[in-house]
């Protein structure tokens, strides 16, 4: 099973512990280093494969029976068609692809032009959003200040908006059947 855009590997490692043969894929070497460290601490180093790859240039050197992709990974990809095509190319017939995405509603109405501030004992975070309707994307800026060390973290990234009809058509085009769509809060239809 492949974890496409595995980030820090939380799901990858949980699935490895559950007995799945896992491939964690991320384009960030920093994220993969975190996964390696966690895997070593858990005694899982030899039980998973980590690959540094861009999902738009995915090459697995073989097939997989399942793939997962969480934390809105596919919203971060500007070319949904190529990313889905790549996942489909390496998927065995009858394979399963489980993923989550933010909806146009969330991008336009929840994130939109809003700013969120989070204050914790050890850090504060300011999350700013700008919805670009013409390009159908949210431009996001995150600033985190760590109180004890005085360190400052700044990141800018985009999430692209894909409507359900586009997602459904893209999946079908690349050999997938959309079995169900669930609400991210209730997990209902």
Model-predicted segments: where are they?
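Class I SAM-dependent methyltransferase SAM/SAH-binding core
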Residues: 12-57
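A short beta-strand submotif of the Rossmann-like class I SAM-dependent methyltransferase core
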Residues: 69-70
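A short His-aromatic
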Residues: 75-76
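A short glycine-rich, Lys/Arg-flanked "PGG" loop and its adjoining helix->strand segment in the class I
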Residues: 81-93
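C-terminal lobe and adjacent flexible extensions of AdoMet/dcAdoMet transferase-like proteins
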Residues: 164-189
